[in-house]
From Swiss-Prot:
It is found in: Secreted; Cell surface. Residues 71-81 have a biased composition (Basic and acidic residues). This is Inulosucrase. GO terms for cellular component: cell surface; extracellular region. Its EC number is 2.4.1.9. InterPro entries: Glyco_hydro_68, Glyco_hydro_beta-prop_sf. It comes from the Bacteria. It catalyses: [(2->1)-beta-D-fructosyl](n) + sucrose = [(2->1)-beta-D-fructosyl](n+1) + D-glucose. Substrate binds at residues 265, 334, 418-419, 516-518, 536.
């Protein structure tokens, strides 16, 4: 979701050096300073040009330091000599003004300046002057020259004294940053007091305060990957001639109540909350999508349906807006949905109140949606909606609230409490993962610029990035407000009327780096949880990175991803930086995509189906070119926490990958006049509206052809050695026939004893 979020673009005209021209010790130097010096040099007299040239030389040296940080003693001596020479020449030239017009001064690099000036003036003297007059003039010139040399000596002495006093009072680097600056090859004697004071503010806290961090270094790597258009991550090219508006998007509009040709963008299927598979509801697949009239603040969610497993884009039907007609003030944005045991849909969505001056007050909400099915007419309709209520608006500590946001710079600061994704863990506990902004636990503000942990690169790289931010007013302003987060809450056991049982610290946060990471999506593959989210790099602080992406590709969108053994914590970035998908074509082409959403492939724990919408909203690709569902494609999840885009593509609007899904005709190429070109006629080289960028440096790329899902023939095992022939067992001897037991003797009948004596015997 982007276009109607009331996110005002920050001015880029404010790019200026905050701390003046950086010295040779600075790692980053704005090119505008050198350009300004060069421009001014064209408008000054020759005697001034020497000083400007010396400054320019030092600025050029700064750029060399920026790329290497290795400075030899010879180069330092040369720079100091240039500065001294320039100062000396200025003094000599000024002293000579008493005898010669400025225009007649000939500036040279040694002490012959005065002599040459004298010679020039002598040559220009009238020819009728007597020799005595000339001699007297020469004496006067010599006296004045001597005075100039004396003045120059005094000035140099005063400069030396001033520099010595300044050195004694110079600020000093302290603690860990002192070692880092030294290790980075920076000459600390060239740092200004302002730079030193700023560097001394840096905090070296070792622990992330709000989950896994998307760092400044990660952001640069993502932009670099986008610019390189690596086929492992670049969104595959689609055949522009095959893309069409969604037939089911012609329906009653929620705001006007009239039949309109609507656009459709952020969409999600009704899924099993534990497996993520698309649910089979009475033989149908159900998808909920944001729809609205083009170029209008019209954002509402609709229910769409098709036979389960049907890949035909034309067969999708529209059950209408879930929350009815006539709701222009209260709108609905992205979310997720799952089935209840009774067949109703439990919907999680973003309720947006626009009544406060269109500031888009976002709240995570839930509702139970009941459906009617008329099988004989192949028709699904919405019966009624119950339990519509707010689940979460932020707690202020882990997640920023609307009231906290209202106290900030609303024009530059993005508000986010949206896009709730439902997932059940292995034990059946239910959670919502959502887009947010960090709260006071790790809040936005200028102090984030001084958190070393936010940078994420080597010490040398971090130092350069720190100075870059301080030297660019727009980057610094963006960094101050950036606090995007992907949050998580645990719900209670009331399935149809859920509330919050526990609020966790964010899974991902980007303080100082980005102010918008949206549409989170968590899927469980095997025993691991994979978290994905969409982002636009121009919501980040690093202007240089996303502007370079715009220049190379004409767009700056991406999908990032992370993996963890636990749902609620411990995520690490995929592909090292978190990059999973990057833009391939300019934002105003028919085949530009966004809002990537990963759906598990049934029977596979190493592949995902990537869905999105195609063609940016507002008819930026041309009149009648509406936002619509894109073809889907496969993403391979590798065991080493890397990913690969596969050359497997579907029709538009395919949410279930099966044997009938693939359609190679939807694949495009980066060739201007090819029948399956990724660009429509006239799109090639067309500038993007927001920056009027042309001449893209697009590169062709080919997704990887996946290995068929069949068992591979195992390697032929070595022939086993023939075992030794076992010994033939001996035939046992016939056992002896046992003796016939003797017949026991028959006992005699005892004599009955009757007398006492007989009994005793």
């Amino acid at each position: 979701m982007l276009e109607n979020k009331n996110h005002k673009k920050m001015s880029l005209s404010g790019k200026s050096l905050l701390m003046g021209t950086l010295s040779t010790a600075a790692i980053v130097l704005s090119a505008s300073t050198v350009n300004a010096a060069t421009t001014n040099a064209d408008n000054v007299t020759k005697n001034q040009t020497v000083a400007v040239s010396a400054t320019t030389t030092n600025n050029e040296t700064n750029n060399q330091v920026s790329s290497s940080s290795e400075k030899t003693a010879d180069s330092k001596t040369e720079k100091d000599t240039n500065l001294t020479s320039a100062a000396t020449k200025e003094v000599k030239a000024d002293a000579a003004k008493t005898t010669s017009p400025v225009n007649n001064v000939k500036t040279v690099a040694d002490t012959t300046t005065t002599t040459k000036e004298t010679t020039d003036n002598t040559e220009k003297s009238p020819v009728n002057f007597s020799a005595d007059v000339k001699k007297n003039d020469a004496v006067k010139q010599d006296e004045k020259a001597a005075t100039a040399v004396k003045a120059n000596t005094e000035v140099k002495a005063n400069e030396t004294s001033t520099k010595s006093a300044s050195k004694d009072n110079k600020a000093e680097l302290k603690g860990q940053i002192k070692d880092i600056v030294k290790e980075s090859g920076v000459d600390t004697s060239k740092l200004t007091d302002d730079q030193i004071n700023e560097l001394n503010k840096i905090s070296f806290s070792k622990e992330a305060k709000s989950g896994t961090q998307l760092t400044y270094s990660d952001f640069k790597k993502i932009a670099k990957t986008l610019i390189e258009q690596d086929a492992r991550y670049a969104v595959p090219f689609f055949n522009a001639s095959k893309i069409k508006n969604m037939p089911a998007a012609k329906t009653l509009d929620a705001q006007t109540g009239k039949v309109e040709d609507l656009e459709i963008w952020d969409s999600w299927p009704v899924q099993d909350a534990k497996t993520g598979y698309v649910s089979n509801w009475n033989g149908y697949q159900l998808v909920i999508g944001m729809m609205g009239v083009p170029n209008t603040n019209d954002n509402h969610i609709y229910l769409l349906y098709n036979k389960y497993g049907d890949n035909n884009f034309n067969n999708w039907k529209n059950a209408g807006p879930i929350f009815g007609l006539g709701t222009p003030v209260i709108q609905q944005w992205s979310g997720s949905a799952t089935l209840n045991k009774d067949g109703s849909i439990q919907l999680y969505y973003t309720k947006v109140d626009t009544s406060d001056n269109n500031t888009n007050h976002q709240k995570i909400a839930s509702a139970t949606v009941y459906l009617n099915l008329e099988k004989n007419q192949d028709k699904i309709s919405i019966a009624h909606v119950d339990n519509d209520h707010i689940v979460f608006e932020g707690d202020g500590y882990h997640y920023q609230t609307y009231n906290q946001w209202k106290k900030t710079n609303k024009g530059a600061d993005n508000i986010a409490m949206r896009d709730a994704h439902v997932i059940d863990d292995k034990d059946g506990n239910r959670y919502l993962v959502f887009e947010a902004s960090t709260g006071t636990e790790n809040y936005q503000g200028a102090d984030q610029i001084y958190q070393w942990l936010n940078y994420g690169g080597t010490n040398k790289d971090n130092l350069g990035d720190f100075l870059q931010i301080l030297s660019n007013s727009d980057i610094k302003d963006r960094a101050k407000w950036s606090n995007a987060a992907i949050g998580i809450i645990k719900l209670n056991n009331d399935t149809k009327n859920p509330g919050v049982e526990k609020v966790y610290t964010p899974l991902i946060s980007a303080p100082m780096v980005s102010d918008e990471i949206e549409r989170p999506d968590v899927v469980r593959l095997g025993n691991k949880y994979y978290l994905f989210a969409a982002t636009r790099l121009n919501r980040g602080s690093n202007d240089d990175a996303w502007m370079a992406a715009n220049k190379a590709v004409g767009d700056n969108v991406a999908m990032i991803g992370y993996v963890s053994d636990n749902l609620t914590h411990g995520y690490v970035p995929l592909n090292e930086s978190g990059v999973v998908l990057t833009a391939s074509v300019p934002a105003n082409w028919r085949t530009a995509t966004y809002s990537y959403y990963a759906v598990p492939v049934e029977g596979r724990d190493d592949q995902l189906l990537i869905t999105s919408y195609i063609t940016n909203r507002g008819e930026v690709a041309g009149k009648g070119m509406h936002a619509t569902w894109a073809p889907s494609f496969l993403l391979q999840i590798n065991p080493d926490n890397t990913t690969t885009v596969l050359a497997k593509m579907t029709n538009q609007g395919d949410w279930i990958w099966d044997d009938s899904s693939e359609n190679a005709d939807m694949m495009g190429v980066l060739e201007k006049d090819a029948p399956n070109s990724a660009a429509l006629p006239g799109e090639w080289g067309k500038p993007v509206d927001w920056d009027l960028i042309g001449g893209y440096n697009l590169k062709p790329h080919q997704p990887v052809t996946p290995i068929p899902n069949v068992p591979t023939t195992p390697e032929k095992p070595e022939n086993p050695t023939t075992p030794n022939t076992p010994d033939t067992p001996h035939t046992p001897t016939t056992p002896n026939t046992p003796d016939t037991p003797r017949t026991p003797e028959v006992p005699t009948t005892p004599v009955k004893k009757t007398t006492q004596s007989e009994l005793r015997s």
